[in-house]
């Protein structure tokens, strides 16, 4: 109980004192993903964020309470720090976000995946909305998908569209003699943007 109270105190009172820009600098310095900034998809996304400073500011503010924890956990688990930014896309760092498809929480787990990942749910508690539990489950899930695909981009795509779809598309491309990387797969538009 003491640990939990200390965590709440640090999360709400001490961490916000540190500059959000400092954390963004640390994330940039620890970035692991290799990608081509020349890709039209990336240029389009960059332009959206560059032209909508209000959106970036709002997302940064929403993430202020949670991003440090997610970043810290990814570093401690030796995972790419970019994984800590997925809630930026999933829920805009809103632990109470609810999708029309029933996904919930900061990581937007659907109920079946949440159950598979051991997140509890009852009449008063939903583990999908628990920052610590859902972050642990999300990173476990992503790690599992990475072990299957050996590719972080495909692991992230699996998080969005499900592993069966990724496996099906990889198999289809292999059978056709095509590349099996993220950019070569035919994926739903939402997943491609993701």
Language-model features: where?
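An acidic, Gly/Ser/Thr/Pro-rich helix-cap/linker signature
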Residues: 1, 15-78, 83
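Short alpha-helical patches at coil-to-helix transitions and adjacent helical residues
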Residues: 3, 63-67, 103, 131-135, ...
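Substrate-binding/active-site groove segments that recognize
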Residues: 101-124, 135-142
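Contiguous mid-protein beta-loop-alpha structural module that forms a pocket-lining wall or clamp
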Residues: 124, 133-193
């Amino acid at each position: 109980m003491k640990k939990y109270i200390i965590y709440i105190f640090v999360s709400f009172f001490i961490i916000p004192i540190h500059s959000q820009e400092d954390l963004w600098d640390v994330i940039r310095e620890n970035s692991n993903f290799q990608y081509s900034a020349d890709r039209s998809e990336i240029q389009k996304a960059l332009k959206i964020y560059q032209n909508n400073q209000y959106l970036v500011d709002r997302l940064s503010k929403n993430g202020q309470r949670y991003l440090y924890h997610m970043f810290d956990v990814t570093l401690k688990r030796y995972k790419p720090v970019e994984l800590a930014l997925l809630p930026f896309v999933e829920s805009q760092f809103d632990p109470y976000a609810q999708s029309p498809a029933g996904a919930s929480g900061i990581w937007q787990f659907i109920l079946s995946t949440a159950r598979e990942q051991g997140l509890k749910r009852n009449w008063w508690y939903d583990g999908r909305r628990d920052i610590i539990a859902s972050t642990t489950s999300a990173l476990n899930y992503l790690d599992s998908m990475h072990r299957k695909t050996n590719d972080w981009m495909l692991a992230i795509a699996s998080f969005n569209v499900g592993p069966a779809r990724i496996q099906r598309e990889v198999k289809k491309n292999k059978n056709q003699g095509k590349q099996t990387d993220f950019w070569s797969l035919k994926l739903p538009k939402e997943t491609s943007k993701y």
